[in-house]
Amino acid sequence: MRPDDKPHLIDRVLQDNETVTLGGETLIAHRTPGHTPGCTSWELDVEENDRTYTALINCSIGVNPDYQLYQNSDRPDIVADYRYSYGMLRSLDIDIPLGGLGGSHPGMYNLTDKYERIGETPNPFIDPGGYLYEIAINEQAMGLRLEEQRRAAEAGNR
Protein backbone atom coordinates (compact mmCIF):
# COMPACT_ATOMS: atom_id res chain seq x y z
CA MET A 1 0.00 0.00 0.00
CA ARG A 2 1.37 3.33 -1.02
CA PRO A 3 -0.91 6.28 -0.19
CA ASP A 4 -0.76 8.79 -3.03
CA ASP A 5 1.76 6.40 -4.63
CA LYS A 6 4.46 7.70 -2.30
CA PRO A 7 6.92 5.47 -0.46
CA HIS A 8 6.49 5.05 3.28
CA LEU A 9 9.06 6.67 5.51
CA ILE A 10 10.83 3.99 7.53
CA ASP A 11 11.92 4.95 11.05
CA ARG A 12 13.59 1.62 11.71
CA VAL A 13 13.44 -1.99 10.63
CA LEU A 14 12.13 -4.20 13.41
CA GLN A 15 13.67 -7.52 14.27
CA ASP A 16 11.88 -10.48 15.79
CA ASN A 17 10.85 -9.84 19.43
CA GLU A 18 11.56 -6.10 19.31
CA THR A 19 9.04 -3.78 20.90
CA VAL A 20 7.12 -0.74 19.76
CA THR A 21 5.28 1.56 22.17
CA LEU A 22 2.20 3.38 20.91
CA GLY A 23 -0.01 5.48 23.15
CA GLY A 24 1.49 3.91 26.25
CA GLU A 25 0.93 0.34 25.03
CA THR A 26 3.94 -1.84 24.29
CA LEU A 27 3.65 -4.36 21.49
CA ILE A 28 6.11 -7.18 20.79
CA ALA A 29 6.79 -7.96 17.13
CA HIS A 30 6.81 -11.64 16.17
CA ARG A 31 8.01 -12.66 12.73
CA THR A 32 5.35 -14.92 11.14
CA PRO A 33 6.38 -15.11 7.47
CA GLY A 34 4.41 -18.15 6.24
CA HIS A 35 1.44 -16.42 4.65
CA THR A 36 3.39 -13.41 3.44
CA PRO A 37 7.11 -12.58 3.67
CA GLY A 38 7.50 -9.83 6.25
CA CYS A 39 4.25 -10.69 7.98
CA THR A 40 4.36 -9.73 11.64
CA SER A 41 2.11 -10.70 14.55
CA TRP A 42 1.83 -8.40 17.55
CA GLU A 43 1.68 -9.43 21.20
CA LEU A 44 0.47 -7.09 23.94
CA ASP A 45 -0.84 -7.20 27.48
CA VAL A 46 -4.42 -6.11 28.18
CA GLU A 47 -6.16 -5.70 31.51
CA GLU A 48 -9.69 -6.56 32.57
CA ASN A 49 -11.03 -6.68 36.12
CA ASP A 50 -7.58 -6.33 37.68
CA ARG A 51 -6.21 -9.25 35.63
CA THR A 52 -3.61 -9.06 32.90
CA TYR A 53 -4.08 -11.15 29.77
CA THR A 54 -1.79 -11.61 26.80
CA ALA A 55 -3.38 -10.83 23.43
CA LEU A 56 -2.05 -11.50 19.95
CA ILE A 57 -2.99 -9.66 16.77
CA ASN A 58 -2.04 -12.43 14.43
CA CYS A 59 -0.93 -12.05 10.86
CA SER A 60 -2.74 -14.57 8.69
CA ILE A 61 -1.58 -18.17 9.04
CA GLY A 62 -3.78 -19.75 6.37
CA VAL A 63 -2.69 -20.98 2.96
CA ASN A 64 -4.44 -19.18 0.12
CA PRO A 65 -5.96 -21.49 -2.53
CA ASP A 66 -3.52 -20.36 -5.22
CA TYR A 67 -0.35 -20.76 -3.11
CA GLN A 68 2.24 -23.13 -4.51
CA LEU A 69 3.88 -24.88 -1.57
CA TYR A 70 5.67 -27.76 -3.26
CA GLN A 71 8.83 -26.79 -5.17
CA ASN A 72 8.00 -23.09 -5.24
CA SER A 73 10.87 -21.49 -7.15
CA ASP A 74 9.70 -17.95 -6.31
CA ARG A 75 9.51 -18.69 -2.56
CA PRO A 76 11.65 -21.77 -1.91
CA ASP A 77 11.36 -21.26 1.87
CA ILE A 78 7.56 -20.98 1.96
CA VAL A 79 7.01 -24.33 3.71
CA ALA A 80 9.81 -23.67 6.21
CA ASP A 81 8.31 -20.20 6.82
CA TYR A 82 4.88 -21.66 7.54
CA ARG A 83 6.34 -24.31 9.84
CA TYR A 84 8.40 -21.69 11.66
CA SER A 85 5.32 -19.50 12.09
CA TYR A 86 3.15 -22.32 13.46
CA GLY A 87 5.85 -23.45 15.89
CA MET A 88 6.63 -19.94 17.09
CA LEU A 89 2.96 -19.09 17.58
CA ARG A 90 2.38 -22.33 19.49
CA SER A 91 5.25 -21.38 21.83
CA LEU A 92 3.49 -18.17 22.93
CA ASP A 93 1.20 -18.18 25.96
CA ILE A 94 -1.76 -16.32 24.44
CA ASP A 95 -5.06 -15.71 26.24
CA ILE A 96 -6.80 -13.52 23.67
CA PRO A 97 -6.30 -14.34 19.99
CA LEU A 98 -7.33 -11.64 17.53
CA GLY A 99 -7.76 -12.16 13.80
CA GLY A 100 -5.17 -11.60 11.17
CA LEU A 101 -4.38 -8.74 8.86
CA GLY A 102 -6.10 -5.98 10.76
CA GLY A 103 -9.45 -7.69 11.15
CA SER A 104 -9.86 -8.78 7.55
CA HIS A 105 -10.25 -12.40 8.74
CA PRO A 106 -13.17 -12.25 11.21
CA GLY A 107 -13.65 -16.02 10.91
CA MET A 108 -10.33 -16.61 12.64
CA TYR A 109 -10.90 -17.58 16.26
CA ASN A 110 -14.69 -17.20 15.74
CA LEU A 111 -14.31 -13.45 16.23
CA THR A 112 -17.67 -12.63 14.64
CA ASP A 113 -19.46 -14.87 17.16
CA LYS A 114 -17.39 -13.49 20.03
CA TYR A 115 -18.19 -9.91 19.03
CA GLU A 116 -21.90 -10.69 19.27
CA ARG A 117 -21.31 -12.00 22.81
CA ILE A 118 -19.49 -8.93 24.18
CA GLY A 119 -20.49 -8.36 27.78
CA GLU A 120 -20.99 -12.04 28.59
CA THR A 121 -19.21 -13.69 31.48
CA PRO A 122 -16.73 -15.16 31.06
CA ASN A 123 -15.38 -12.84 28.40
CA PRO A 124 -15.69 -14.79 25.11
CA PHE A 125 -12.49 -13.26 23.76
CA ILE A 126 -10.41 -15.02 26.42
CA ASP A 127 -9.82 -18.22 24.48
CA PRO A 128 -6.37 -19.84 24.75
CA GLY A 129 -7.79 -23.17 23.54
CA GLY A 130 -9.27 -21.54 20.45
CA TYR A 131 -5.91 -19.94 19.75
CA LEU A 132 -4.13 -23.31 19.72
CA TYR A 133 -6.96 -24.93 17.75
CA GLU A 134 -6.72 -22.31 14.98
CA ILE A 135 -2.98 -22.93 14.68
CA ALA A 136 -3.54 -26.71 14.55
CA ILE A 137 -6.21 -26.63 11.83
CA ASN A 138 -4.19 -24.24 9.67
CA GLU A 139 -1.04 -26.30 10.10
CA GLN A 140 -2.94 -29.47 9.18
CA ALA A 141 -4.46 -27.78 6.11
CA MET A 142 -1.01 -26.60 5.01
CA GLY A 143 0.37 -30.14 5.37
CA LEU A 144 -2.50 -31.60 3.35
CA ARG A 145 -2.08 -29.00 0.61
CA LEU A 146 1.67 -29.67 0.46
CA GLU A 147 1.12 -33.42 0.17
CA GLU A 148 -1.56 -32.93 -2.49
CA GLN A 149 0.80 -30.77 -4.55
CA ARG A 150 3.68 -33.23 -4.09
CA ARG A 151 1.54 -36.13 -5.31
CA ALA A 152 0.29 -34.14 -8.30
CA ALA A 153 3.86 -33.22 -9.26
CA GLU A 154 5.04 -36.82 -8.95
CA ALA A 155 2.09 -38.09 -10.99
CA GLY A 156 2.95 -35.56 -13.70
CA ASN A 157 6.54 -36.81 -13.83
CA ARG A 158 5.58 -40.42 -14.57
Residue ranges, per PLM feature:
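Metallo-beta-lactamase
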Residues: 1-37, 60-65, 70-95
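Divalent metal-coordination and catalytic microenvironments
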Residues: 14, 32-35, 42, 101, ...
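Bulky hydrophobic/aromatic packing residues
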Residues: 25-27, 44, 50, 158
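General alpha-helical segment detector with a strong preference for membrane-spanning helices
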Residues: 38-39, 109
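Accessory terminal helices/loops
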Residues: 49, 63-158
